Structure formats: structure tokens, C-alpha cells
Amino acid sequence: MYRIWYITLVGKNPKSLTGIGTQPEALQRQGKHVPAIFFRTEAGGEPVRDWLRGLPSSEDRKRIGEDIKTVEFGWPIGMPVCRPLGDGVYEVRTSLVQNRISRVLFYIDKKGRMVLLHGFIKKTQKTPDEDLELARSNKSKHQRGLK
């Protein structure tokens, strides 16, 4: 399972991020406690998928994908991989190359899916308020039915 997930997430073409958000019900049957899906805007954009595609390093994408996979299979999971931020929003914490740190903010929806709301490279110790507010806004939109 790991090899298939990794190849579809990173593969040779970083624009083919299809390992997340495809057939979540089938993935739950394969042992995932909370299959990850991308939050989708009204316009059809997927902010986390777009952010991942824009990362310059395939090693960064691989590390983030591994940590998301760890949460999918190990939920509920705590530090150092995952931390609650309040209001039902959590962060996946990933150490990247060149001593950088990324965060992918998510929540668990009523269907038991890990909805990836927002991703960013951390530049300060504290999670920036604007990033947390954006994730909360995306969560509200998703809960209102904007998938």
C-alpha cells in the first residue's frame, strides 16, 4: 500500500497528486482510519494540492505525503506528527530538507475523512493567525457543502 500511495503522490510527475482524495471509502476498507481528501473551493481549486505541486523539492512532497499517510493509518495520533489547534482543526507537522518546517491543516468531517484545508511552510515558532483563519474558513465552507 505504501508504495502505491507514494508513487501516486510524488511519482515522476508532481502534477499527478492522485494518491489523496480518490475513492476514500475503498481506502478505509484498506486499513486507513481517516482517508485524506483535498478541500475544494467553489471554483474547483484545491489549495493544498496546488501548494504541494508548487513545492520545489520532490523530497519535500515525499516527506509531507509520508506524514499525511501516518495520520491516515494511525488516527488518532499525537505529537510530534499531529497537534490540535482548536475548533476541530489539526496540523500535520513535517520537517523538510534545509531545516524548513511545513504544516498541513486539516479537520475530520462527519464522514470520517481527513479534509486537507491549507498548507504552508512555517517561518515563525507560532502558527500564523492568518493561516489558521484561512483553514477555519475553508472548514466552514466544506461543512456547508462546498466540497
Describe these PLM feature segments:
Residues V104-L105:
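Hydrophobic/aromatic beta-strand elements that line small-molecule binding cavities or substrate pockets
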Residues M1-I101, K110-M114, I121-K147:
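Basic, Lys/Arg-enriched alpha-helical interface segments
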